[in-house]
């Protein structure tokens, strides 16, 4: 799905690499890495089961769980999740709790402070309390399965976890609600954008912020948002902003759940070759081992489902149940707002201003247990809007601005029950009913049965009295406060449209003037545009849908050419190129000619694709580096981070904004305009290519600049580099940090397709592997199929189980 924040795998903080962990785990020469792999055959007695459960695995290690009761299936799911991904589960839980320093040391303390302030524990408690007794029982049984693994393998944990020295606590049912809340928290891109805007405000004046935070190509600049900050001196007035920005960067590097970027679509029967629906889904994240997603299939009386799960959460979040397919992407809804709070110390108390009066903050105490150090006890301060993300520094300084975070409440929220009901729905109408009850997470849910398709936006979105929430709001006035939430009946939805398809790619999904505030932080529109081009052309089957998932054509290239040829640009640009020094002039002319001939196909072997991407990279530096640089400055880093989260000022300036103040190069005495900067950028693209790819420009290849490289939780390379095509605007996403380098930061971490025209509709692929244990054969075995476009079928009919899963099984039996 799409990207926040803190979009999207797992921590590259200081847990030792698995190989090093294997060598240093106990100092015992007889320790065997293979002992950390639970068996996949034979008999395993486990206390807590009522009856035997069979676990078979396919060639990719994806499990089929067969049981005589749903409770036993959930118990087995907990055991299997822990067997495959215990390090991921433990790390996600610590991340959500704000306790990473316990495993990784003081380097994660700022991130822990950030997450303690966010207080997902409170949100998870509300969500779990509001759930039905049925759902709580499901989570309890799942937790017992996780704990059965922890009890049996306490001394045989995977090397990376064991070498950290951290002893995992037993799993609690509420921990699964916590993982769900973490998934939700990762879905809004706007919180890190708001933090980044404050970092930018330390370098540029408030009136320029609007030029750096556009919403969409056809939207006016958010000048009113910037106006609410007029007269407020932000430079140097936010204690702890550096630490907060560092924490936000750390969380972005961890990528939380890596689901802010994603695609999904459904093809209606009239556009299908078989006359039956199709559904496709792919979610994007860093090239990490393991990826976020874990495939599983469950077959029990009155319940069957297969698809993708997140270890720690006993739900099939996207997949197929034999009748209905469902998938999710991030809607990038904005339901997280930062409020600037005027603070001052009065005696021993910290106070903040509300409508001209000063009142005390609320206080809660937090204790941080830091690996290798004494515990640290600190206060978190809360205003009427929420906790101060910079509590420690604000209290120490006693003046300036606190940063309060407001998020929706989950009181009386039945989202967990609704997600389970979605996985049991037997037709699109029932699926639609279930999705309308999902409030605790902002998603585009696309679903289908053999004859119908549907789409529903879920979540809880605030009604703001004034403002859009795109930039931080003054908290001392009531003008910008929330006034309840949008009526769920206003949430966008559609079913069986005349066009014959539905699809989302994190793009804007509501028209101008829509009756609710959903977001102003949409992704760039190009993936959605390409999806519409392909979905709306001809008839489809699973082969054409696979081709869509692997498509590397960008629609941005055609827009760029249109801009070059626009009546007000063509002649001034030619004149600007002619005015360059001779050496630069010839380079600019070559780049222009090649770009005008470029077909938009970002193949890894394409020379023109290399020139195109070099131009994009160099133009960003030419436009913005003079005011936001140098390249290691906080402002530049914040700007790059914003460009990765939603529609970027880089693209916005290239396609328009001729009156932007950023076209002038502040380093020169004369005033430059857009044609002059574009001419420089064209020449710079060729110079950069000469430097990086050599002098034979016809032999350049995009894939020699742009690579796939998979890394483990410690940031060590485990596979690659391998030439990559595409970029952040292609359906087959291979994003890079625009303005930094061409290293792939985000790519599909899973894909699945449901073709109702097939006797066995579901097929899928994992981005790396099913297991998070480096000694497992299923640790990286998903990469080659991913590179080759190969999917594995997940059959729903029992007579086909042996063909895919074989006859070898692990039998879990009731223990004493």
UniProtKB/Swiss-Prot annotation:
Protein name: Acyl-homoserine lactone acylase QuiP
Signal peptide from the UniProt entry: 1-33
Domain of life (superkingdom): Bacteria
Listed GO biological process terms: antibiotic biosynthetic process; quorum sensing
PANTHER family: ACYL-HOMOSERINE LACTONE ACYLASE QUIP (PTHR34218:SF4), PEPTIDASE S45 PENICILLIN AMIDASE (PTHR34218)
Functional note: Catalyzes the deacylation of acyl-homoserine lactone (AHL or acyl-HSL), releasing homoserine lactone (HSL) and the corresponding fatty acid. Possesses a specificity for the degradation of long-chain acyl-HSLs (side chains of seven or more carbons in length).
Disulfide bonds: none
Key word Hydrolase present: yes
A GO MF term: hydrolase activity, acting on carbon-nitrogen (but not peptide) bonds, in linear amides
Reactions accelerated catalytically: an N-acyl-L-homoserine lactone + H2O = L-homoserine lactone + a carboxylate
Organism: Pseudomonas fluorescens (strain Pf0-1)
Annotated Gene3D superfamilies: 1.10.1400.10, 2.30.120.10, Glutamine Phosphoribosylpyrophosphate, subunit 1, domain 1, Penicillin Amidohydrolase, domain 1
E.C. number: 3.5.1.97
Family: Belongs to the peptidase S45 family.
Active site as annotated: 262
Location within or outside the cell: Periplasm
Main location: periplasm
